[in-house]
């Protein structure tokens, strides 16, 4: 029997037919064969006997009542059967989707396809799912609050009133209000997920008192020149004062070519004296975890009940606890209610700093989330709204994260900021 996944709501019919065209044809052929068999097995009508109405008319009253009771019992059985069938169908659907995703990840790990396809599909799907859930009931709500606090502080630290901001991989526009508080004059957001950009536009139109221009564009920030994406938007005021990238830069380190294209996009978009800042996985924390895993483990992994990191091979351990290359060191990252086993890439920070220097940028800041938060929170606690302060409060009355959320929030990520000091000559 041909198993065919249902079309996701965010996928167009054309994309669905392109991806599963061969399966659709097999399914149609199977359906026709099944209908032919059913037709052949169907009993022919007998000319002898009574019609349904005539049979009911001949029944006595007690027989009709018994038939009603039996009918209700049968209906209940059918309802239970239908419910079980629905559950089976959902389980089967989930299994098929997981198999397809596993296949896509394997293809990415073997470099048959690049990571863009998997990333775009994941964030299109997450955008749809997020509409159905109230984030206030998220199991990682404290982690989200902590990450937002880090971004608020970073934005305030490097952004000035009147600045023009370019955000790479802007997602659903979650930082629009943060930039509003900084008093910027223009925000240019670019993201590879068209569903995320659509949601960002809705968010922007629903906001009040945002006194700056917002331009949202679907485009590839890492794989191609930004000129391709922004050429239809002459209102963009390049060069910018700020380029920001939050929790997404790791996708650029799939290859050296991508990492260099990303940095070229940054320096071409940025004024001399402007800042490039963001948040990335902390390569030193990843090394610390990997160093504790023996070479005998083929697929090193670690995590807890809300997050998990899994490498596709143990080349790091075989190479004397060093990554064989600064690029293409893939792992899958799962975070409860946020990231569903999406391929990501290690950003060895010294390699990142060296490349940035080559492109005319000097390092201004690099601190892990925990260190950065501990240093900055005394100056910020009274600047946050009461709701934000409450969202950051731990069970001991202090501010930050605790329990299972602490590792993926406070230790897995680091902040960075570079300042452009000279133009890059290609």
UniProtKB/Swiss-Prot annotation:
It is found in: Nucleus. The keyword Nucleus applies. MRNA binds at residues 147-148. One of its GO terms (cellular component) is nucleus. Residues 138-421 form the mRNA cap 0 methyltransferase domain. Keywords: Methyltransferase, mRNA capping, mRNA processing, Nucleus, RNA-binding, S-adenosyl-L-methionine, Transferase. It comes from the Eukaryota. Pfam families: mRNA_G-N7_MeTrfase. This is mRNA cap guanine-N(7) methyltransferase. Responsible for methylating the 5'-cap structure of mRNAs. It catalyses: a 5'-end (5'-triphosphoguanosine)-ribonucleoside in mRNA + S-adenosyl-L-methionine = a 5'-end (N(7)-methyl 5'-triphosphoguanosine)-ribonucleoside in mRNA + S-adenosyl-L-homocysteine. GO terms for molecular function: mRNA 5'-cap (guanine-N7-)-methyltransferase activity; RNA binding. PROSITE patterns: RNA_CAP0_MT. Belongs to the class I-like SAM-binding methyltransferase superfamily. mRNA cap 0 methyltransferase family. S-adenosyl-L-methionine binds at residues 151, 169, 191, 220, 246, 251. Gene3D superfamilies: Vaccinia Virus protein VP39. Its EC number is 2.1.1.56. The gene is ABD1. The record marks 172, 178, 203, 250, 344, 413 as: mRNA cap binding. SUPFAM superfamilies: S-adenosyl-L-methionine-dependent methyltransferases.
